[in-house]
């Protein structure tokens, strides 16, 4: 993904304010609620029947944190997202058979949740930079798909 130096500074600066254990679960919970067909990949997660069930589900929170921990690793390698996410791309493609469109949806949920939590710090310029990043991550995760 191509970011200017100013965009990289915005992305890394704001990421320091993100709490992956909170935002990850919320972003994944929103994805599962707004796009219920994505729940089929999480059969073992228990009750996903309502917004309150999703937001209080320990497995959703734990997996959301795991997702954001991986995203955080990607932020350290913005110039090599495909390499950084190659093994996750292979896993999601070959073993889990996740529709790659879901990566875009989750990225958009992450941007929305960040805007909600960061408030005024999440400026239009920050949003534009993060939209580039989540699009780049989604492309990298979809790379192994045929």
Swiss-Prot record:
<dbReference type="InterPro" id="IPR002337">
    <property type="entry name" value="Hemoglobin_b"/>
</dbReference>
<dbReference type="GO" id="GO:0019825">
    <property type="term" value="F:oxygen binding"/>
</dbReference>
<feature type="modified residue" description="N-acetylvaline">
    <location>
        <position position="1"/>
    </location>
</feature>
<dbReference type="GO" id="GO:0072562">
    <property type="term" value="C:blood microparticle"/>
</dbReference>
<dbReference type="GO" id="GO:0046872">
    <property type="term" value="F:metal ion binding"/>
</dbReference>
<feature type="modified residue" description="N6-acetyllysine">
    <location>
        <position position="82"/>
    </location>
</feature>
<keyword id="KW-0408">Iron</keyword>
<keyword id="KW-0561">Oxygen transport</keyword>
<dbReference type="GO" id="GO:0005833">
    <property type="term" value="C:hemoglobin complex"/>
</dbReference>
<feature type="binding site" description="proximal binding residue">
    <location>
        <position position="92"/>
    </location>
    <ligand>
        <name>heme b</name>
    </ligand>
</feature>
<protein>
    <recommendedName>
        <fullName>Hemoglobin subunit beta</fullName>
    </recommendedName>
</protein>
<keyword id="KW-0597">Phosphoprotein</keyword>
<keyword id="KW-0349">Heme</keyword>
<dbReference type="GO" id="GO:0031838">
    <property type="term" value="C:haptoglobin-hemoglobin complex"/>
</dbReference>
<feature type="modified residue" description="Phosphoserine">
    <location>
        <position position="44"/>
    </location>
</feature>
<feature type="domain" description="Globin">
    <location>
        <begin position="2"/>
        <end position="146"/>
    </location>
</feature>
<feature type="modified residue" description="N6-acetyllysine">
    <location>
        <position position="144"/>
    </location>
</feature>
<dbReference type="InterPro" id="IPR009050">
    <property type="entry name" value="Globin-like_sf"/>
</dbReference>
<dbReference type="InterPro" id="IPR012292">
    <property type="entry name" value="Globin/Proto"/>
</dbReference>
<comment type="subunit">
    <text>Heterotetramer of two alpha chains and two beta chains.</text>
</comment>
<feature type="modified residue" description="N6-acetyllysine">
    <location>
        <position position="59"/>
    </location>
</feature>
<keyword id="KW-0813">Transport</keyword>
<comment type="function">
    <text>Involved in oxygen transport from the lung to the various peripheral tissues.</text>
</comment>
<comment type="similarity">
    <text>Belongs to the globin family.</text>
</comment>
<dbReference type="GO" id="GO:0005344">
    <property type="term" value="F:oxygen carrier activity"/>
</dbReference>
<keyword id="KW-0702">S-nitrosylation</keyword>
<dbReference type="GO" id="GO:0042744">
    <property type="term" value="P:hydrogen peroxide catabolic process"/>
</dbReference>
<feature type="binding site" description="distal binding residue">
    <location>
        <position position="63"/>
    </location>
    <ligand>
        <name>heme b</name>
    </ligand>
</feature>
<dbReference type="GO" id="GO:0020037">
    <property type="term" value="F:heme binding"/>
</dbReference>
<dbReference type="InterPro" id="IPR050056">
    <property type="entry name" value="Hemoglobin_oxygen_transport"/>
</dbReference>
<dbReference type="GO" id="GO:0043177">
    <property type="term" value="F:organic acid binding"/>
</dbReference>
<dbReference type="InterPro" id="IPR000971">
    <property type="entry name" value="Globin"/>
</dbReference>
<dbReference type="GO" id="GO:0031720">
    <property type="term" value="F:haptoglobin binding"/>
</dbReference>
<dbReference type="Pfam" id="PF00042">
    <property type="entry name" value="Globin"/>
</dbReference>
<dbReference type="GO" id="GO:0031721">
    <property type="term" value="F:hemoglobin alpha binding"/>
</dbReference>
<feature type="modified residue" description="Phosphothreonine">
    <location>
        <position position="12"/>
    </location>
</feature>
<dbReference type="GO" id="GO:0004601">
    <property type="term" value="F:peroxidase activity"/>
</dbReference>
<keyword id="KW-0479">Metal-binding</keyword>
<keyword id="KW-0007">Acetylation</keyword>
<feature type="modified residue" description="S-nitrosocysteine">
    <location>
        <position position="93"/>
    </location>
</feature>
């Amino acid at each position: 993904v191509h970011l200017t130096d100013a965009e990289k500074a915005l992305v890394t600066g704001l990421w320091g304010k993100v709490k992956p254990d909170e935002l990850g679960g919320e972003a994944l919970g929103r994805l599962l609620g707004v796009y219920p067909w994505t729940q089929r990949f999480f059969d073992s997660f228990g009750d996903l029947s309502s917004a309150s069930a999703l937001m209080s589900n320990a497995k959703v929170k734990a997996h959301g944190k795991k997702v954001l921990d991986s995203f955080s690793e990607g932020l350290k390698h913005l110039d090599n997202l495909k390499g950084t996410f190659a093994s996750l791309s292979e896993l999601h493609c070959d073993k889990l058979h996740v529709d790659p469109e879901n990566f875009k949806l989750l990225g958009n949920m992450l941007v929305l949740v960040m805007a909600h939590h960061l408030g005024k710090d999440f400026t239009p310029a920050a949003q534009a930079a993060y939209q580039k990043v989540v699009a780049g991550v989604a492309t990298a995760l979809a790379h192994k798909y045929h």
